[in-house]
Swiss-Prot record:
Pfam families: PMSR. The active site is at C10. It is an enzyme of class 1 (oxidoreductase). InterPro entries: Met_Sox_Rdtase_MsrA_dom (IPR002569), Met_Sox_Rdtase_MsrA_sf (IPR036509), MsrA_MetSO_reductase (IPR050162). PANTHER family: MITOCHONDRIAL PEPTIDE METHIONINE SULFOXIDE REDUCTASE. GO terms for cellular component: cytoplasm. Keywords: Oxidoreductase. GO terms for biological process: cellular response to oxidative stress; protein modification process. Signal peptide: none annotated. This is Peptide methionine sulfoxide reductase MsrA. Its EC number is 1.8.4.11. It comes from Clostridium botulinum (strain 657 / Type Ba4).
Length: 157
């Protein structure tokens, strides 16, 4: 099994979208790469912690490759906009690819370079090693499964 953490705006939609992909074994939403230990949603939303709302993904590489997973990720975000996806604004809504394995960096940077050819503006999606990931509160986990009419900036149909 392999792991990656993806930030694509509000984590509810990213988790729901990713959880529907064949080969995804586990998803969890949380707060990635900030400066405060174990922050709450309220504190992250204040914009003072540096965390991004993100989705931890465990996947079976024999079913879906990292390259294929990233292609699906690029389809659900606007990688040229900083700190905004859909109606959500703030540093916690920035886009990012946070890797746990240094060997994945080449695949990620090649994917980002290929994706850049689709845009005139520069892609601002962060590519960084995962420094920290704090699981979000339970009510955020599988939020759109529990609340199918809940807000989502991603078209899931």
């Amino acid at each position: 099994m392999k792991e990656i953490v993806l930030a694509g705006g509000c984590f509810w939609g990213v988790e729901e979208y990713m959880s529907r992909i064949k080969g995804i074994v586990e998803t969890k939403v949380g707060y990635a790469n900030g400066i405060k230990e174990n922050p709450s949603y309220k504190v992250v939303c204040s914009g003072t912690t540096g965390h991004a709302e993100a989705c931890y993904i465990k996947y079976d590489e024999s079913i879906i490759s990292l390259e294929e997973l990233l292609n699906k990720f690029w389809n659900i975000i606007d990688p040229t906009v900083l700190n905004k996806q859909g109606n959500d604004r703030g540093t916690q809504y920035r886009t990012g690819i946070f890797y746990l394995n240094e060997k994945d960096l080449n695949i990620i940077t090649e994917s980002k370079s290929r994706e850049q050819k689709n845009y005139k503006k520069a892609i601002v999606t962060e590519v960084e090693p995962l420094k920290c990931f704090y699981e979000a509160e339970e009510y955020h986990q599988k939020y759109l499964k529990k609340n199918p009419e809940g807000y989502c900036h991603i078209h899931l149909d």
